[in-house]
Swiss-Prot record:
Reported induction: Form II RuBisCO is expressed in the presence of form I, when grown in air with or without 5% CO(2), although it is not the major activity. When the form I gene is disrupted the RuBisCO form II activity increases, but is not found in carboxysomes (at protein level).
Broad class of where this protein is predominantly found: cytoplasm
Subunit structure: Homodimer.
Protein name: Ribulose bisphosphate carboxylase
Cross-referenced PROSITE patterns: RUBISCO_LARGE (PS00157)
InterPro entries in the record: RuBisCO (IPR033966), RuBisCo_large_chain_AS (IPR020878), RuBisCO_lsu_C (IPR000685), RuBisCO_lsu_C_sf (IPR036376), RuBisCO_lsu_fd_N (IPR017443), RuBisCO_lsu_N_sf (IPR036422), RuBisCO_lsuII (IPR020871)
Organism: Halothiobacillus neapolitanus (strain ATCC 23641 / c2) (Thiobacillus neapolitanus)
Amino acid sequence: MDQSARYADLSLKEEDLIAGGKHILVAYKMKPKAGHGYLEASAHFAAESSTGTNVEVSTTDDFTKGVDALVYYIDEATEDMRIAYPMDLFDRNVTDGRMMLVSVLTLIIGNNQGMGDIEHAKIHDIYFPERAIQLFDGPSKDISDMWRILGRPIENGGYIAGTIIKPKLGLRPEPFAAAAYQFWLGGDFIKNDEPQGNQVFCPLKKVLPLVYDSMKRAQDETGQAKLFSMNITADDHYEMMARADFGLETFGPDADKLAFLVDGFVGGPGMITTARRQYPNQYLHYHRAGHGMITSPSAKRGYTAFVLAKISRLQGASGIHVGTMGYGKMEGEGDDRNIAYMIERDEAQGPVYFQKWYGMKPTTPIISGGMNALRLPGFFENLGHGNVINTAGGGSYGHIDSPAAGAISLKQAYECWKAGADPIEFAKEHKEFARAFESFPKDADAIFPGWREKLGVHK
């Protein structure tokens, strides 16, 4: 059934829809299956994503038609399809009238992903009007709170050198806490790796007090504050809160130095919102493990990493992993810096839409995945700043001297870039950075050919 007369209006202008402020706009890359017209398939897609089905129903009235999603732009050659969703379509909380991301996702990326006449459809950008921004929580804490704890300026406080305890699984409580202490002697921030929680060989109630003891000893020894991101992910929200409450009790007077890590992609929006609302005084660390199944450029369905990061800010993530923009081991490219710009700025241009955030707090880009001191100067040059959290596991624990030296080498890499210095020349005056060349020789060969002769390592 051709529903384009009802669910498509190509006379609508995008600028008018944005100015009206009553629609969430979604840009897809969509391809119909063979034998289906592009406009017809687009209209069916909009119908299935809002008020319609595959047949006319007798219960539809004029009000219902007033909240139809409308296709307002198509370009079959580029597979571009854009749909305007009226704000009134989306579910609101009974308790406070606020919007919920599960409702948004259910419509814009729900049943339409399994339609018989659609070959594939993937969201590449989404626009939220001011009213929608107001109806989501947004972050309660941001990187400025981390800088304050670390004793830095709360504007442009710079690079936060972090790590992930490695190996990711298999350490018992005492070795785990010892690994944390070794890094904190040089670094700022440690996160649980996403599988770490309450394994039988490393019970949470045994390991966490030891980690806090490591933090206190490192703080006493260095005279500097330290930060820990604790994984509270669980199937059950009450289990999440039990873990979080134990963390706050354990860290006591240092509870402000405790962030909560949530596996938001596998756990779902409810897990992020629970953490955001129940613990507004903690930095909410959004880990996105599993996202690649839909965000990968090779995937034709779902949504992109850009869209994932954007909706994480709406939900209230203080920070989210954004990959390494082609400088680490994960999928990515230099243009992924636009992901960071979208979540850290008050307004930014996306692939399709220019988004204003109307004062919503920023979400920190968290950089991880195969990074070390040698890769960082190029990364910072591409991004244009160093106001990020970087969790370098191998880049710290793989340093030839010690995890603390690995942490120091990361900080020195930032200072090298910030000073505009030549990394080889900078290494001659900074031992830990220089030893990173010997620690990661394959990277050194690829990024800095001839480094052995220049640093005298061949002698």
